[in-house]
Amino acid sequence: MYQARPRRRVQAPLILLPVLLLAAACGMPNRVRSMFGGQLPIQVTISPDANENSPLAVELIVVYEDKIVDKLLEKKAREWFSGREQFLRDYADDVDSWKWEWIPGQEIQPLELSYGMGAKRVVLFADYVTPGEHRAAIDPQKPFRLVLGQSEIALEEVR
């Protein structure tokens, strides 16, 4: 004799999936986005007198391991740029990296970078000719404006 079995177990995930997708799309806490990866919107402003009126290399690194975040936050920009190739080879599976070179006063269209699941931190380095750390860090879930001033780098959260 055949007995119908309740389908609650199948229905619950099917009902839950659209709810989770809707919640993620509507701005569920930013940490959820980090768990699954996402898009990182970035605005860039470059001062007309940035870097003593010389082109400025900038690198953005999305980091997926806390120990690597700590290593990067110990580095000054000059150290980063001189050893970046080896660092990226050593930690190829634990970071994503984007590099640009901009000129003072250049207008940059808004950027949107894709990052993977489990991103811990975004670290940026700017290769100014003047001495200094020239490093900044922010959560990957927070849209931001990168401000490249005359002799320093700054990040501003964008709401």
Identify the role of each PLM range.
Residues Y2-I15:
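Bacterial N-terminal signal peptides that target proteins for export
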Residues A23-A25:
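C-terminal motif of bacterial Sec signal peptides marking the signal peptidase cleavage site
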Residues G27-P29:
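Bacterial signal peptide processing site
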Residues R33, R121, T130-R159:
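Glycine-rich, aromatic-bearing surface loops/beta-hairpins
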Residues P41-R78:
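Early exported N-terminus immediately downstream of N-terminal targeting peptides
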Residues S47-D49, V63-E65, G116, D127-V129, ...:
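Solvent-exposed coil/turn segments that connect beta secondary-structure elements
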Residues E74-Y115:
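Tryptophan-paired
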Residues I108-V129, H134:
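Helix-rich interaction surfaces within compact, conserved domain-sized segments
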